[in-house]
């Protein structure tokens, strides 16, 4: 067993040394984004076969739902047999759109107890990567979807949306939003990053309440980790901008769906960077209330993938535990707590193939099983995700060579 001991585009605003140091990061981030976009463009059909980003969710009856982006469109399909067969897909979009194809972008989907489906995704509105978050819903079991609507009337850039479903059917949305940059500039103030905004829906994602600011000056370009810590209390992990331009992760737990809480730093990684990592964190809350988080950093204090947990609602966290083999470029961590244990997965590359590594904790994050390869590919692939039907945890992974895979996480000794 392993004990938990360790752990939009780049924008350079000032300084010649900063420009030189960030040139490589900027090129790498844009190359990754354009490379993924080119891969998507090579397969023009809106089918699952052509998908580059696939997001899973289980319905209350055990039906698996997938939402994916392919051919400039967003589609959904369902499977009654854990991914062995799928229904004919339903296109959510009615025409080809300039979908957000950044490394951390994907459609988001949740399915409520009545079978209602809430969906959200973002599009690019211009060549400067300014985005807009759109949402829709289905009330007929995925046969059709309502007309797409913007999640906020504001026209400033919105990206990196996340959805979470409460026990009472409330849908909670959070995203990164740049509406405060223009007022700041007009007032002569420097504005960094973006604002963490949120809104909730009590009618199954038919309408959302007015958007509110939870936290300003957060990192503008990493996915959010969002869940409910308890009924009526969303919790979100995000890359914050701390003093000195340090972009480390923070957790916020809401008092209710309308009231943001204080932020608490997950770890002092000391990653001082004036650029966009495009490598977001993961958050899950166990049935007993323990917060489990996984993240990537390239800070002065530590570099790579790390895990930590909190037993006081995210106020303090355990010492970071390192994940993966540094020589194999571990990336894209995802963690999910279930009634039978907490599972973590991430990707590694050995020079020839990409593998998904998995580890399980049976004691609430104190110790972890030795990492095990549970899937691999020699071609491009999506981020590994975890999904549960309440009884079984699965790895959800889309690969170019083998298509969509749903792999049951088997019990470990």
Descriptions of predicted regions:
Residues 32-413:
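Extracellular, repeat-based ectodomains that mediate carbohydrate processing or recognition
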Residues 15-27:
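Bacterial N-terminal signal peptides
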Residues 3-4, 23, 41:
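Exposed, low-complexity/repetitive linear segments and helix-based recognition motifs
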Residues 1-12:
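N-terminal secretory signal peptides that target proteins for export/translocation
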Residues 10, 29-32:
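Residue-level detector of intrinsically disordered terminal segments
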């Amino acid at each position: 067993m392993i004990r938990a001991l360790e752990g939009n585009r780049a924008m350079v605003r000032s300084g010649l040394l900063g420009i030189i140091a960030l040139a490589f990061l900027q090129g790498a981030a844009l190359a990754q984004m354009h490379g993924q976009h080119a891969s998507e463009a090579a397969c023009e059909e809106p089918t699952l076969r052509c998908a580059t980003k696939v997001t899973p969710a289980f319905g209350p009856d055990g039906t698996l739902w997938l939402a994916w982006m392919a051919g400039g469109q967003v589609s959904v399909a369902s499977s009654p047999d854990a991914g062995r067969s799928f229904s004919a897909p339903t296109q959510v979009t009615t025409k080809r759109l300039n979908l957000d194809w950044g490394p951390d972008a994907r459609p988001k989907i949740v399915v409520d107890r009545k079978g209602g489906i809430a969906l959200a995704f973002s599009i690019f509105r211009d060549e400067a990567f300014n985005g807009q978050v759109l949402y829709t819903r289905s009330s007929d079991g995925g046969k059709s979807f309502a007309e797409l609507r913007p999640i906020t009337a504001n026209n400033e850039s919105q990206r990196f949306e996340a959805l979470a479903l409460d026990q009472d059917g409330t849908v909670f949305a959070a995203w990164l939003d740049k509406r405060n940059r223009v007022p700041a500039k007009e007032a002569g103030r420097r504005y960094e990053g973006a604002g963490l905004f949120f809104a909730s829906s009590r009618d199954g994602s038919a309408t959302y309440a007015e958007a509110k600011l939870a936290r300003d000056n957060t990192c503008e370009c990493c996915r959010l980790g969002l869940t409910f810590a308890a009924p009526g209390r969303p919790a979100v992990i995000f890359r914050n901008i701390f003093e000195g331009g340090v972009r480390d992760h923070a957790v916020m737990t809401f008092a209710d769906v309308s009231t943001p809480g204080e932020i608490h730093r997950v770890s002092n990684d000391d990653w001082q960077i004036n650029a966009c990592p495009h490598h977001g964190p993961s958050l899950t809350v166990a049935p007993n209330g323990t917060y489990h988080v996984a993240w990537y950093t390239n800070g002065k204090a530590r570099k790579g993938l790390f895990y930590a947990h909190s037993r006081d609602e995210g106020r303090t966290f355990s010492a970071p535990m390192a994940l993966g083999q540094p020589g194999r470029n571990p990336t894209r961590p995802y963690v999910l707590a279930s009634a039978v244990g907490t599972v973590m997965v991430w990707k590694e590359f050995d020079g020839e193939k990409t593998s998904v590594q998995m580890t399980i904790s049976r004691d609430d994050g104190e110790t972890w099983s030795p990492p095990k390869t549970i899937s691999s590919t020699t071609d491009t692939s999506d981020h590994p995700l975890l999904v549960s039907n309440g009884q079984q945890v699965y790895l959800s992974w889309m690969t170019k060579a083998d298509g969509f895979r749903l792999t049951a996480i088997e019990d470990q000794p």
